[in-house]
């Protein structure tokens, strides 16, 4: 019985730091928040300017293995909508999964490439994953957004 109690206590004491090691500390969350917001704003700026070759470099390794640079750029050019910016009504939020994996939840204002007055706001969750010391985006998600067609069309 004493061995069982000792084993349980050791398991709790030794296992507890491992469980908490996966969650960022408040200081780490603040640093991650600042870093990812800058990365996200930079990525959004590239998207606004339709600089798809540079966006591709910010893609996750898995995405780049599936999509070639040419495929990605072609699919992005074919999209009718580009972001104008972030909605001022609701600030972006970060949903942490681990120190190296998070979702940036943002309300993005999109504008039609041909009809500039046609705009809409859509909430989007962007997956960011840290690879080789840099935050990377899911490019597959990018070629599918924003999926909107005006009513009465």
List the predicted regions and their residue ranges.
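A generic structural signal for short
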Residues: 31-32, 113
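Short solvent-exposed beta->alpha transition segments
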Residues: 23, 28-31, 37-38, 42, ...
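Sec/Tat signal peptide C-region and signal peptidase I cleavage site
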Residues: 17-21
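Bacterial N-terminal signal peptides
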Residues: 7-15
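Exposed beta-sheet edge and beta->alpha loop/turn motif
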Residues: 94-153
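Positively charged n-region of N-terminal signal peptides that target proteins for export
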Residues: 1-4
């Amino acid at each position: 019985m004493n061995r069982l109690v000792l084993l349980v206590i050791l398991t709790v004491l030794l296992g507890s730091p491992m469980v908490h090691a996966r969650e960022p500390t408040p200081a780490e969350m603040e640093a991650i928040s600042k870093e990812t917001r800058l990365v996200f704003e930079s990525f959004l700026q590239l998207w606004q300017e339709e600089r798809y070759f540079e966006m591709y470099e910010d893609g996750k390794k898995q995405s780049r293995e599936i999509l070639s640079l040419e495929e990605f750029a072609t699919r992005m050019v074919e999209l009718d909508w580009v972001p104008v910016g972030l909605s001022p009504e609701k600030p972006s939020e970060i949903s942490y999964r681990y120190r190296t994996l998070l979702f940036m939840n943002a309300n993005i204002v999109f504008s039609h490439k041909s009809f500039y007055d046609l705009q809409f706001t859509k909430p989007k969750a962007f997956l960011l994953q840290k690879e080789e010391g840099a935050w990377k985006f899911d490019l597959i998600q990018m070629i599918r957004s924003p999926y909107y067609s005006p009513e009465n069309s």
